[in-house]
């Protein structure tokens, strides 16, 4: 990506200086690149992953590459753009050909059709009008979101931000013209995510077909952040968190990820188990996550772990 040539680092006093080394692919994929954050207002209204990444390159780095973990969707998107340049294919086409089709992930897409949209889970939240820890309500009260979205999709009309947020997209773009990006926007199902997890658990093999080399899986699931701290329970690999201590029933070395709406997937090589838990909650507290995830993970390991 030649547009990153000459990128500078911003000092605390606003001064600029050359980085000790240019950012690497490894740093991009383990969130230590120092790239600008996706919340910057100058990054809105782009029409392609190529445009997005070109904008990232115009901003100075927030800190020296490799010195701080800072979860950064701009880095993940830059990785996706590298895929486009190296493969010569749009990101969505590459993912479809190399991953989704071989895994039979028929419901994984950035552009749900009418039948898929009708099955979309709505985002839930607490009932703030009548607080009750046991009661959740739909995040958006409109019960006809999928039908309205499909109508607008077919007409190429803009879809309101609130509707997109309820669907789980979380971005106010014209739906029919959305572009695929690694940082978010894909829809999927438990079956499809489970197939991905199974392939990773089997060191890159799914139904007797190798999709990733065993070395690639070892690399992505190995700690890539070195001594840079991430959080007390985890370090980071290539696009995945890696457990550095037993946590929520998962063993050291388990790897996986969680989404903004609290969906999680983990691969636990020690227990020979892959777990995908699909959740649609914006306001789930850290304590609630510990209780729910821990209970589900421990129950799954007890029932399906190596002892069985």
Features from the language model and the residues they span:
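Active-site-proximal flexible loops/turns
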Residues: 38, 275, 287
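Short, surface-exposed beta-strand/loop micro-motifs that present aromatic residues
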Residues: 261-274
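Short loop/turn motifs at secondary-structure junctions and domain boundaries
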Residues: 256-259
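A short acidic/small-residue loop/turn micro-motif
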Residues: 281-284
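Surface-exposed amphipathic alpha-helical segments
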Residues: 289-308
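Short, surface-exposed loop or secondary-structure junction motifs
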Residues: 5-252
């Amino acid at each position: 990506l030649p547009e990153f040539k000459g990128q500078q680092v911003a000092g605390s006093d606003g001064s600029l200086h050359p980085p000790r080394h240019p950012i690497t692919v490894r740093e991009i994929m383990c969130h230590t690149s120092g790239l600008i954050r996706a919340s910057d207002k100058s990054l809105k209204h782009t029409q392609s992953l190529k445009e997005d990444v070109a904008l990232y390159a115009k901003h100075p780095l927030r800190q020296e590459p490799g010195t701080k973990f800072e979860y950064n969707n701009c880095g993940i998107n830059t990785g996706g753009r590298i895929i486009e340049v190296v493969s010569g294919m749009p990101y969505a086409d590459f993912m479809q050909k190399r991953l989704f089709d071989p895994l039979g992930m028929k419901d994984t897409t950035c552009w749900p059709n009418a039948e898929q949209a009708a099955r979309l889970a709505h985002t839930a939240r607490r009932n703030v009008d009548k607080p009750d820890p046991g009661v959740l309500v739909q995040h958006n009260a409109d019960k006809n979101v999928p039908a309205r979205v499909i109508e607008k999709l077919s007409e190429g009309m803009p879809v309101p931000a609130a509707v997109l947020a309820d669907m789980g997209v979380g971005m106010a773009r014209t739906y029919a013209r959305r572009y695929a990006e690694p940082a978010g926007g894909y829809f999927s199902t438990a079956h499809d995510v489970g197939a991905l997890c199974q392939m990773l658990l089997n060191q890159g093999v799914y139904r007797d077909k190798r999709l990733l080399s065993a070395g690639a899986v070892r690399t992505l699931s190995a700690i890539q952040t070195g001594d840079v701290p991430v959080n007390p329970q985890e370090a980071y690999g290539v696009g995945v968190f890696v457990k550095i201590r037993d946590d929520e029933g998962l063993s050291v070395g388990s790897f996986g990820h969680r989404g903004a709406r609290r969906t999680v997937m983990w691969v636990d090589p020690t227990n020979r188990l892959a777990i995908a838990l699909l959740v649609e909650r914006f306001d789930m507290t850290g304590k609630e996550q510990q209780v729910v995830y821990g209970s589900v993970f421990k129950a799954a390991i007890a029932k399906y772990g190596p002892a069985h």
